Swiss-Prot record:
It is found in: Secreted. SUPFAM superfamilies: alpha/beta-Hydrolases (SSF53474). It comes from Polistes annularis (Paper wasp). This is Phospholipase A1. Expressed by the venom gland.
Length: 301
């Protein structure tokens, strides 16, 4: 039977976390305008949207862990977007091409919905769009890109940052900017590549980190494991001071320099402060098999 992955705004749920709502609360579309979470105190907060990918949910364990890491790090307002029906969570399997194609088609709808939510935050609750960051995994990375395009169409400006966690590869390998996550979708676009099979293997951001050359990740035997590691790497970079260092790399043409030769103007730390480093382009990031994963030989950038 064909999977029913029909997108409907009414099916979207938001899991919202903050320092005074650490266990999270659940919002739906009809409650967005009257919930007391969005008050005058929201204006000054840094807001982070988390957007999951194919077959996943907004309260998957990796996103819950990242949400907790974010609110421990700073007074973030974290909004995890659950579009699980549109992502075929209940109906498809990883081998279901029809279900996946439907989920791909739904990413634009979800992106527009996130952009409309952003408009509400900006216009009604006076949140600065320069304080809003999107973090998307797999299809969620491209969804974040579509949201970034939509907020620009709405003349709201650009998001502060989009972090694409191993943006989905299938159906996107030959896509141009209008049809995928792109460097122009936010003021700064950071991309973490961890699977050459399930993720895109070309530069799409201001900085593109190829962790372990963007191929199989340490400790992983399946592509799905490597694909998910991007989420875990970022979470650990948020939780710990340990810097996962990226050193400049021209794919296919050169061997990256050892991180022992890194300087603050040539290399970049993966994570929320990546934009503070001047270097742009593609970077190779060596990684350890176990958390906190960083392989930096004690180097301080």
């Amino acid at each position: 039977m064909s999977p029913d992955c029909t997108f409907n705004e009414k099916d979207i749920v938001f899991y919202v976390y903050s320092r005074d709502k650490r266990d999270g609360i659940i919002l739906k579309k009809e409650t967005l305008t009257n919930y007391d979470l969005f008050t005058k105190s929201t204006i000054s907060k840094q807001v982070v949207f988390l957007i999951h990918g194919f077959l996943s949910t907004g309260n998957n364990e990796n996103f819950v862990a990242m949400s907790k890491a974010l609110i421990e790090k700073d007074d973030f307002l974290v909004i995890s977007v659950d579009w699980k029906k549109g992502a075929c969570n209940a109906f498809a399997s990883t081998k279901d091409a029809l279900g996946y194609s439907k989920a791909v088609g739904n990413t634009r709808h979800v992106g527009k919905f996130v952009a409309d939510f952003t408009k509400l935050l900006v216009e009604k609750y006076k949140v600065l769009i320069s304080n809003i960051r999107l973090i998307g995994h797999s299809l969620g990375a491209h969804t974040s890109g579509f949201a970034g395009k939509e907020v620009q169409k709405l003349k709201l400006g650009k998001y502060k940052e989009i972090i694409g966690l191993d943006p989905a590869g299938p159906y996107f390998h030959r896509s141009d900017c209008p049809d995928r996550l792109c460097v122009t979708d936010a003021e700064y676009v950071q991309v973490i590549h961890t699977s050459i099979i399930l993720g895109v293997y070309y530069n799409v951001g201001s900085v593109d980190f190829y962790v372990n050359y963007g191929k199989n990740q340490p400790g992983c035997n399946e592509p799905s494991c490597s694909h998910t590691k991007a989420v875990k790497y970022l979470t650990e970079c948020i939780k710990h001071e340990c810097c996962l260092i990226g050193t400049p790399w021209k794919k296919y043409f050169s061997t990256p320099k050892p991180i022992s030769q890194c300087r603050g103007d040539t290399c970049v730390c993966v994570g929320l402060n990546a934009k503070s480093y001047p270097a742009r382009g593609a970077f190779y990031a060596p990684v350890e098999a176990n958390a906190p994963y960083c392989h930096n030989e004690g180097i301080k950038l």
